[in-house]
Amino acid sequence: QLMKEGKLHYGGGKCELIRVGAMDDIDIALGHHTQAGCDMSIMNGTSNGFINKTVTFTGRSAHAAGMPHHGVDALNAATSAMVNMALQQESYRDEDTVRVHYFIQDGGTAVNVIADHVTMQVCARAKTPEAYKDASMKVDRSLRAAAMATGCGLHIESMAGYMSEMANPHIEVLKSVLDDIAAEGKYTNVK
């Protein structure tokens, strides 16, 4: 809802904090994510980078029972796009941990009206920039194919998300700081 109202511009909280200037006077952030059940943790894992997209299919409304042939169904385009994106799954390498998520944000006005406007949110994420750029390209291709097949207009707005995060094996300095500030056993070193 906040994105729809224009109050948030990015799909990630940290991106939004940077956009509004909340990080302007901060040189480094050692802690950047919450984890339930653990006061502090050192994560020696990775985190996928991603690209977010706001997608709009534009069709032509018509009465769904009386004159559906006069309409161009934007909801059909969105449905086709979701199938197309799902069918790309086997083209991704397992080691790239590619994930593509999507949902329909606005999908019509009534059951008896051919939808002339559908908005979707899509996120393409992967372990490396090369992999999530490849996934993003395949998402765009899937969206364009759906628009072409249904005769709908298409607008894709791609927004930068996070870069991929790789583990830093030289984390002993941070561990010693946590030893000083945290009670015994109040942090974990996840490998």
Predicted regions span which residues?
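Histidine/acidic-residue-rich, glycine-tolerant segments that coordinate divalent metal ions
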Residues: Q1-H101, T109-N112
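Short, solvent-exposed polar/charged micro-motifs at secondary-structure junctions
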Residues: C38-S41, E165-P169
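Conserved short loop/turn motifs at secondary-structure junctions
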Residues: Q1-K4, M159-S164, K191
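Short gly/pro-enriched beta-turn/loop segments at secondary-structure junctions
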Residues: F50, A115-H117, E157
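Short, hydrophobic beta-strand segments
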Residues: V55-G59, T119-A126, I156-A160
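A cross-domain feature marking catalytic cores of carbohydrate-active enzymes
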Residues: H32-T34, I104, A124, S158
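Acidic-enriched catalytic cores of C-N bond-cleaving enzymes acting on peptides and small amides
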Residues: P68-Q105, A110-V113, T128-E157, A167-V173, ...
